[in-house]
């Protein structure tokens, strides 16, 4: 019941409960278990609501990253579940200082992730090299892999990582679907 959507995009009331319309144009039919909307919006809604990051903890920021998965903060309630394998993940959280010797390993893990893939740089060291201005330290993860979201701080609190994931969800919701994985 509720409303019927016409070809012009307007909704005609037919009685019963009204439709719930989200900000991205999806129409939810309460009680019917149905969703109507553009294909991009439906796919992005599903992908943004179920981010599966692989952790790449390199230093003290990794402790704060682990705290976000613990009971007090609980990332699972947002649909964010840490994965053990990059082949099952769609996001990589790089937390800490990236040495030049570790850079090829980071690139290899990134290449093993399926498309679409995202990178979240957590902490000052991952964002810009931090205090370690050295010949042995990469000055930012973005020199090795493309970074989508930067979470600054030394170390950033779990709430800052939450904010980074929310920004990543906003990026995912604005994307257009790619029909070919080979581009």
UniProtKB/Swiss-Prot annotation:
Species annotation: Desulfovibrio desulfuricans (strain ATCC 27774 / DSM 6949 / MB)
Localization in the cell: Cell inner membrane
GO biological process: aerobic respiration; electron transport coupled proton transport
EC number: 7.1.1.-
The keyword Ubl conjugation is annotated on this UniProt entry: no
Catalysed reaction equations from the record: a quinone + NADH + 5 H(+)(in) = a quinol + NAD(+) + 4 H(+)(out)
GO cellular component terms, A-Z: plasma membrane; respiratory chain complex I
Known cofactor(s): [4Fe-4S] cluster
Name under which the protein is recorded: NADH-quinone oxidoreductase subunit B
Domain of life, per lineage: Bacteria
Role noted for this protein: NDH-1 shuttles electrons from NADH, via FMN and iron-sulfur (Fe-S) centers, to quinones in the respiratory chain. The immediate electron acceptor for the enzyme in this species is believed to be ubiquinone. Couples the redox reaction to proton translocation (for every two electrons transferred, four hydrogen ions are translocated across the cytoplasmic membrane), and thus conserves the redox energy in a proton gradient.
Family: Belongs to the complex I 20 kDa subunit family.
GO function term, MF aspect, one: NADH:ubiquinone reductase (non-electrogenic) activity
Residues reported in the UniProt entry to bind [4Fe-4S] cluster: 60-61, 125, 154
Note on cofactor: Binds 1 [4Fe-4S] cluster.
Record's bilayer topology term: Peripheral membrane protein
Record-linked NCBIfam families: nuoB_fam (TIGR01957), PRK06411.1 (NF005012)
Chief location of this protein within or outside the cell: membrane
Keyword annotations of the record: 4Fe-4S, Cell inner membrane, Cell membrane, Iron, Iron-sulfur, Membrane, Metal-binding, NAD, Quinone, Translocase, Transport, Ubiquinone
